[in-house]
Amino acid sequence: LENYPAPLSPSLQLLDAQDLQASRDRSLLLLGGYLGFGLLVLFLGWVHVRLYGDRVFVAYVSYVACMLGFQVAFTGLGGLFFWPQHWVWNDTAPALFMLWLTASGIWFVREVSALQRHSRTLYRLATFWSLFGFAYPALYFMFLSPAAFKLLNLYGLLSVLLSMGLCIWAWRKGEVHAGWTALGFLPLHLAYPFPALRSAGLLPDSWATQYAVLIGSAIEIPLLLYILHRRAKDFNENSARMRVSDSTDPRTGRP
């Protein structure tokens, strides 16, 4: 068995027909539940876009959409149900959505950390890093070499470190919700090494390498939405207090 450009790390199991069918049923139930939950969170995120008109929610919705696309492609659900006849797309979709997921994640971090207000250098770095992730699939599929695959994995690893670093830096600058966002990312970042090590050929294919990111993201995306909801609510309350203060006579306390 050979796979290109990613190494193949199969694990062998002996199952009878009944056990195989039971395993398939459990997997489909898990994936179906995840997809339905993810679509619900995506809808709620879009409601917040319409409600608050904040760019951070647009970035969040893009991040969740790419996450769902990645999970559908990576777990094989897409090839089984959504595009069974399109084998070329089935082969390219996991890498494409992985890069777009990472790029949209950095875009989301850029917005939630308010980098433009604190450091134009870091703002430009995050912008460039995100744009690179959106554009790199064109180069990756053009060359499709082991070197291009290593660069893809390196981009994913460095993006994990960059996202946490930017959130913690912004938190120390006074962006309280950036610190909470760093904690919200933890479930996914702790799950990331399992598929990454499998892609590098260091771990065999297993339940953990297949579903760790799915479980991590199922915890992460509602946490991030709640953090963003609290952020928007706090900003609105602060804006309301400032409007009242500006319209009040400081000597009499009356409008």
Features from the language model and the residues they span:
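Alpha-helical transmembrane segments and their helix-entry boundary regions
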Residues: V56-A59, W180-T181
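Membrane-proximal, cysteine-centered motifs at transmembrane boundaries in secretory-pathway
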Residues: L1-F43, V49-R50, D54-F57, T75, ...
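Conserved hydrophobic/aromatic pocket- or pore-lining residues that grip, position, or stack substrates
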Residues: G53, A65, V109, T252
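Structural signature of the GPCR N-terminal helical module
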Residues: A59-C66
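Interfacial "cap-and-anchor" motif at the non-cytosolic start of specific transmembrane alpha-helices
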Residues: C66-E111, Q116-A240
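Conserved nucleotide-binding and Mg2+-coordinating catalytic segments in signaling enzymes
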Residues: M242-P255
